[in-house]
Structures are given as C-alpha cells and as structure tokens.
Amino acid sequence: MSIVIEVKAIPKSKISAITIDKLGRLCIRITSAPENGKANREIIKLIAKTLKLPQANVEIIAGLTIKLKRIRITSSFLNEGELMNALLPSMQQKLFE
C-alpha cells in the first residue's frame, strides 16, 4: 500500500523534526542545507526512521527542488490513520518545546 503526503521542507533548521505549521501543514525541519540533494536525503531518512521503515520505502515524487514536496510512503502495514498516529508522537514532542 502506498500513501502520498504533502510536506513543507524547512532546511537549515537547528534540529531535525516533524512539526505542523500555523496553517496545519506537515513540516519537515532538517539541519541540512538545500544543496546537492542533502536536504532531500535527510527528509527521507527522518521519515523512514520515524515510521520504522527502510529508506527505500520513502520517495520524494514531486518537489525535489522546492520546499513543498509530495512524498510516497510504501508499507504493507501502514494505512493513512496509522501513518498519522506514528508521526503524532514526534510532532507533539516538538510542538510543545
């Protein structure tokens, strides 16, 4: 099963984290600069680690060179609700810091 999510990338952040912005968008904060694909690789690594999936199961399908990205997550055991439940602890921790 594949799920596509839209995220806003925020490169050169102090910490790597998954958060929600004031508009309710899912944001991926990464410490890498947006050069030579470093930020995109860090986004994939962070999402995969958070969801406990192999990095090969996370793919940026649109927005390789811009901040707004579409990401495909492939997993045989995660549906959309389970995906959000897996991301929530990470987001809640960063929302209240």
From Swiss-Prot:
Pfam families: DUF167 (PF02594). Signal peptide: none annotated. It comes from the Bacteria. GO terms for cellular component: cytoplasm. Belongs to the UPF0235 family. This is UPF0235 protein Aasi_0294. It comes from Amoebophilus asiaticus (strain 5a2). The lineage of its organism: Bacteria, Pseudomonadati, Bacteroidota, Cytophagia, Cytophagales.
